[in-house]
Amino acid sequence: MHDILASLRAAVGGPVLTPEQDGYRAEIAGFDLAQDHRPPIAVSAVTVRDVVATVRIAAAAGFPITVIGDGHGDIPRVTDGILLTTRRLTDVRVDIADRSAVVGAGATWHAVLDVATPAGLAPLCGSAPAVGVVGYLLGGGMGPIGRTFGFSSDHVRSFDIVLADGELRTVSAERDPDLFWALRGGKGGFGVVTSATVELLELSTIYGGGQFYPAAAIPAVLRAYQRFVDSDVPDSLTTSVAILRLPDLPMLPPPLRGQTVAQLRVGFVGAAAEAEDLLAPLRATVPAPIFGTIGELPYAEIGTIHNDPTVPSAHATAGILLDRFDADTVQAVLAVAGPQVATPLGIVEIRHLGGAFTGPASPPDAVSGRGAAFGVWVSGAPMQLPFDPNAMSHTAAAVRGVLDAVAPWSTGAVQINFCGSVNTAGGGRRVVARDH
C-alpha cells in the first residue's frame, strides 16, 4: 500500500489520509453516524484533476473506489480500497440568460439557491437544501413542487464524469445517451460525477409551508389528508403529511419541543388565492394548528416547508412506494406509528406523488418511482448517546414494522433516493428502473 499512497500524494492536491492521521475521521464522516466507514485510504479531491488522478492510480493498482459527496446517501460500510470525497468541489456557476447552472459534485442546493434566486431563477431542489446536488440528481429527486415539475433529474442537461479508466467525459442526451439514461436515476457505479448542468425555473415565489398539529389530532389529520388527496387535486399542488416525534431541544420552537405532532407540508405553484381555495376543504376538517404557517414563500426559503434535520445523527431509514393510500392504509400507519405507540421512530411521512412524477421522461431515464401514487419515508434514531448498536437494532425493527404495515398497498419497489439502511439490510426491497 506504500506505493499507492506515494503515488496519490504526489498526484493529488487534496488530503490523502490513512486511519492513524489527524483529519481522517472528519474526512470520511457522513450524515448517518451509524455508518462507521474504515477505508485504508481516504482521498479528498479539490479539483477535477484530483479525481482523474485518483481513478487512474486506483485502476492501475486494482483498488476499488467508493465515492462520497456531502455524505447524505446510504452507503454500505466501507472497509477496503479508497474512499474518495468530492465535498470540496463546490463551484456553482449560473448563466442567467441560459437559465442554467453548472454545479460541482460537492455543492449543496443551498449554494445554488444563494446564486440563482436573486436573479429570479429556481433550481428544482429537494426538501432539504443542505443535501448535495449531484448525489440527489443521480437518484432522480422528489422535491416539494415535484407534482408540478417532475423529478429533479428531468431538468439535467449534462453531467461531467470520470470513467473507470480515468477518462473525463461530458455526457448528455446527444453525447453518450445510454450513459446519460443510466446516470439520471441509476444513482451510482458508472464513474465519478464531478459536476452537473441543470436547467433553472423562472420562479421567484411559491405558496407553501408547514403546519403542525398536536398528538391528539394526528388520527384526524391523517384521515382528513387521505380524503383530500383522494379528491381531484391539481398537479400544481404537492403535499405530504408526517408524524413527527421531536426531541426536547432548544433549537426547536417551544410548542414543538419533545412533542409528537403531525405536520402538513404544502408546495403550490400559482396564485395564493387559488391555493387557499384548494386547501379550504382540508383545513375545515382538522383542528387548528399549534405552530407553523402556509402562505406566500420566497423560493429561496423552500427548505422551510419540511425543515429537515441538518445535524448528523445515527439513524435507521427506509422508504417504500404505494399504489394507493386509503382509509385502511391510514389505520395501518396509526397502529404502528400513531401517538399511542412508544417507538423510536422520528418521522413517518406519506408523500402524494402522481402529477408530473408519472413522466414519461424525455429523454428516457432510469428513475425509479414513476407511476407510484404515494411514497412513504421512515426514519428512526436512538435517543441515548453515545451511539449504542443494540438500540439501533431496536430502531431498525421499528422502521421495518412500518414497511410491513403498509406492504399490502406497496408497489414492491423503493424510490432509490429513499432506499435506506433498513431497505438494504439482508437484501432489502426492489428498486425498479424504467425500461431503456
Report the location of each language-model feature.
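Soluble FAD-dependent oxygen oxidases
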Residues: M1-H436
